[in-house]
């Protein structure tokens, strides 16, 4: 079964089993609602041997989520999971509108310019503010390129071919 990362359990909060979660999903209100089942994995790369938990309480504060899981009602029950990755099964993903993508669909794609010049590979996605930023790892030790996900820059995403076509704005490359 395939799992996809939606957060990281970064710390405990208080003594009643509440945990602090850094969110890496565009749908936190859906992923972290009461009754939702999640899987906890020791490392981000693990796909088997996860622990299934069910959310008993959830609240959002300053971009973080504070969760309590059913049956884990004190700090001793949850402390061992600090640093663990929170994932959902592939079946929990829903279809997105045209032009929208899950992170796992974008990371790893090759990037070429509109002049068909290879630029590199998307290695991660940042969400600093109004627009996501796609980080492109370049070949031969060149510095990474930060591409804002705006229509003026991202011209085409072809998931089948594994290629993103971009138009470089002045100043995007050193």
Swiss-Prot record:
UniProt entry keywords in alphabetical sequence: Chaperone, Cytoplasm, Ribosome biogenesis, rRNA processing
Keyword Cell cycle: no
Secretion signal span: none
InterPro entries per the UniProt record, alphabetical: PRC-brl_dom, PRC_barrel-like_sf, RimM, RimM_N, RimM_N_sf, Transl_B-barrel_sf
Compartment list: Cytoplasm
GO BP, one annotated term: rRNA processing
GO function terms (MF aspect): ribosome binding
Subunit structure: Binds ribosomal protein uS19.
Domain notes: The PRC barrel domain binds ribosomal protein uS19.
Record's function text: An accessory protein needed during the final step in the assembly of 30S ribosomal subunit, possibly for assembly of the head region. Essential for efficient processing of 16S rRNA. May be needed both before and after RbfA during the maturation of 16S rRNA. It has affinity for free ribosomal 30S subunits but not for 70S ribosomes.
Protein name: Ribosome maturation factor RimM
The organism of origin for this protein: Lactiplantibacillus plantarum (strain ATCC BAA-793 / NCIMB 8826 / WCFS1) (Lactobacillus plantarum)
Gene: rimM
């Amino acid at each position: 079964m395939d799992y996809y990362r939606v957060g990281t359990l970064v710390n405990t909060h208080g003594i009643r089993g509440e945990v602090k979660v850094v969110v890496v999903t565009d749908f936190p209100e859906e992923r972290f609602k009461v009754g939702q089942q999640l899987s906890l994995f020791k490392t981000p790369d693990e796909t088997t041997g996860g622990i299934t938990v069910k959310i008993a309480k959830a609240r959002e504060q300053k971009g973080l989520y504070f969760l309590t899981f059913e049956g884990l009602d004190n700090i001793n029950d949850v402390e061992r999971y600090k640093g663990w990755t929170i994932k959902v099964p592939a079946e929990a993903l829903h279809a997105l509108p045209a032009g929208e993508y899950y992170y796992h669909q974008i990371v790893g794609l090759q990037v070429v310019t509109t002049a068909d010049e290879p630029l590199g590979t998307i290695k991660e996605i940042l969400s600093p503010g109004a627009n996501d930023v796609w980080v492109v790892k370049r070949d031969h030790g060149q510095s990474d390129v930060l591409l804002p996900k705006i229509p003026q820059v991202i011209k085409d995403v072809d998931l089948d071919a594994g290629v993103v076509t971009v138009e470089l704005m002045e100043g995007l490359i050193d």
